[in-house]
A protein has these predicted regions:
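Short, glycine-/small- and polar/acidic-enriched structural segments
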Residues: 29-162, 169-170, 186-190, 212-214
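Second-shell loop/turn segments in exported
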Residues: 45, 137-142, 185, 223-226, ...
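Small-molecule pocket liners
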Residues: 45-46, 115-121, 204-205, 216-220, ...
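Pocket-lining segment of extracytoplasmic ligand-binding domains
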Residues: 94, 168-169, 173-261
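Secondary-structure end/capping motifs
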Residues: 228-304
Length: 326
């Protein structure tokens, strides 16, 4: 009887040990799994990539988990990159310039083609303002340091005005829309899909979009640490972004139906915003570096950033193997 009891005890002990070993191995595997934290906004290709779920499947093969965090604008997203809450994200042209000026250790990874109609200066439907020149002395809402900041500067210059000729009111998109609806500001400089939403829901009138003034590239950026330690993951990410962009070109209806619920807007508004974007991500070209340098120099001259910047110093150069796969 004592022998049977001992045998049962040993069996139970070995079973417990095996279970503990399995749990420990599973925990170790979980601990070893890396995480790619992506910051996105209510526009652009990353929203589509999130909707499709192809990146998660691709990176799961490499033991990489993907986590997504939404931001209201580019400056806020780049602050997230700077403090280490995300590893990779998308912004317009101006936020990286302000981030570099503030000392953020970020790298430009890739860009989308120009999308100049995807941002605009809007006025209320009944506004007496008919031209950019008539903004002199007026209150203009914008998200400071965002892509539309440069659009406003260029539009004013083109109309013969200086930045000091208007009163900028710096507000994130939701607050800016509220101020626009209340009549607290005379104009609002904004990007899609907020732009399309204001046009469709408020019948806001476009005073000037980016056509002939700005490129309005989407830029993909990463922390220097993440890009340098994980070049293969970054390469896969750019490849997937490009693939989704190519898919969108021939599947606007499906893309719209996938994105609309994610951003909480109607299919009509979403489709217009999707149509206005540029698709076809590429690693950063010398021409794009030159264009970004011009933007940086403009903000330095306006004393909106404190020092001269060199854009080429913050461009990610993918390893040859990664570049060949693109």
């Amino acid at each position: 009887m004592r022998t049977i009891t001992l045998r049962r005890s040993l069996v139970a002990l070995f079973a417990a040990a095996s279970s503990f070993g399995a749990i420990t191995q599973a925990q170790a595997a979980s601990d070893n799994k890396s995480v790619l934290r992506i910051g996105y906004q209510k526009y652009g290709t990353l929203v589509l990539l999130k909707a499709k779920g192809t990146l998660e499947k691709r990176l799961a093969e490499q033991g990489v988990e993907v986590k997504w965090t939404e931001f209201p604008g580019g400056p806020q997203l780049l602050e997230g990159l700077n403090v280490g809450s995300v590893d990779f994200g998308v912004t317009g042209e101006t936020p990286p310039v302000f981030a570099q000026a503030a000392g953020a250790d970020l790298l430009y990874v890739a860009h989308e083609p120009p999308a100049p109609t995807g941002e605009a200066i809007l006025v209320p439907k009944d506004s007496p303002i008919k031209s950019v020149a008539e903004l002199k002395g007026k209150k203009v809402a914008l998200n400071k340091g965002s892509n539309v900041h440069y659009l406003l500067v260029r539009a004013l210059e083109d109309a013969g005005l200086k930045y000091g000729d208007i009163t900028p009111v710096y507000l994130p998109p939701a607050d800016a829309r509220a101020a626009f609806e209340r009549g607290s500001v005379d104009a609002w400089v904004i990007w899609d899909p907020f732009q399309s939403a204001a046009e469709k829901q408020l019948q806001a009138r476009t005073l000037r979009d980016g056509s002939g003034l700005v490129d309005n590239h989407q830029f993909y950026l990463a922390t220097r640490t993440y890009a340098e330690k994980n070049p293969q993951v970054v390469g896969v990410l750019v490849e997937e972004i490009r693939g989704v962009g190519e898919w969108v070109k021939g599947n606007l209806d499906e893309a719209t139906s996938q994105v609309a619920p994610l951003i909480g807007l109607s299919p009509e508004i979403t489709r217009q915003a999707v149509e206005r974007q540029g698709y076809g991500a590429q690693f950063i070209s010398p021409e794009v570096v030159e264009a970004q340098q011009k933007i940086a120099d403009t903000f330095t001259e306006l004393k909106l950033i404190p020092k001269q910047l060199t854009i080429k110093d913050v461009i990610w150069n993918p390893p040859a193997k990664v570049a060949q796969n693109q």
